[in-house]
Amino acid sequence: MKVLFFNSPPFFLAHGGMQTLTEALMRELAGLGVEVEPERWWDENQKGDIIHYIGRPVALTVRAAHQKGFKVIMTENLGQTASRGWKRRFAQRALTDLARRALPGGFLDRLGWEVYQELDAMVYVVEHEWETAKYLFHASPERGHIIPHGLEPEALTELARPQKPEDYLVCMASIYPVKNNVLLARAAQLAGTPIVFLGKPYAEDDSYFLEFKQCVDGKVVRYAGFAAGEDKNRWLRGARGFVLLSQYESGCIAVYEAAAAGLPLLLTDLPWANKVYGQVPAAKFVGLGPPQRIAPALKRFYEQAHRQASATFPLLTWRQVAARYLEVYRKILGGA
């Protein structure tokens, strides 16, 4: 079995969870005996059995792949769409259905809506995103699969190690508006709640990053930059709790890492969080709003939060995740 991977946008333009997923899948699938390669757009002689798109391809591409004998699978992030209110999603479905009837087929192909009926398999990290795909785009119900992200076994072991607790909360996320880093920093200042931010911007001269740095005072709000390996693990193990006020997420790996460290969670009261972690006893939720509205909830969370001796919720290794993808590959190849 040979699988070709395609990721858009490319990693040099946007780092994040989908890069981590792609790299982990290619590595772990190879360990399970699957031949993997990146899709070589310049190589007209490249061969394979499956094309795995990380992100939505256009229908014309899927049809061309089928004509060449490939099966096609997509892993899609619908976090933003799935976090919209039901009224907006209802209106979007109505407009989408109207456009399907009114617009010519070639135009619809460019929008990518028809791809949900033509893919051999679709994978989502969380259930509510798959439900959104079926609701909005009439995705074929029998072709959907829910496979969460994972972590390295070494990371699970290292994050679970005991460490002397310190008095701070931690937020680990890229520094850009979707993550609401500035909002959280200002709320922490109002609450007098010490917090450490880990992460990097998409550009050092980005205006949002510059605004964020103005909130850093080195006392209540600290910024440790991008952290990896033991440096990241140390910050997580020493924290009282983990906070993330994103507008949307899709199986956020930072949340998984915080859970592996046994940290209680304070997350946005939006579907990406409350529908996924709503049954987790150590998870709390706060609605988005101005800093003065968030500050009291942040202060209460800080006062009550303490690291647990075990993971906040069950987690998989990347090898286990890859094994689930391999089951899907075999299914669409007819049990090969």
Predicted regions span which residues?
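Conserved donor-binding/catalytic core segment of Leloir-type glycosyltransferases
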Residues: 162-179, 185-192, 196-198
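Conserved acidic donor-binding segment of nucleotide-sugar-dependent glycosyltransferases
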Residues: 283-291, 299-303
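A charged, aromatic-enriched C-terminal amphipathic alpha-helix characteristic of glycosyltransferases
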Residues: 17, 303-334
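Acidic anion/phosphate-binding donor-loop and adjacent secondary structure
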Residues: 134-135, 142-166
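Short hydrophobic beta-strand element within catalytic cores of glycosyltransferases
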Residues: 264-267, 274
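Aromatic "clamp/platform" in nucleotide-sugar-dependent glycosyltransferases that forms part
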Residues: 247-248
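Short, structured helix-loop element that forms part of the nucleotide-activated donor/catalytic region
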Residues: 19, 194-221, 231, 235
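Membrane-proximal helix-turn-helix segments that form the acceptor-binding/catalytic region
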Residues: 97-122, 131
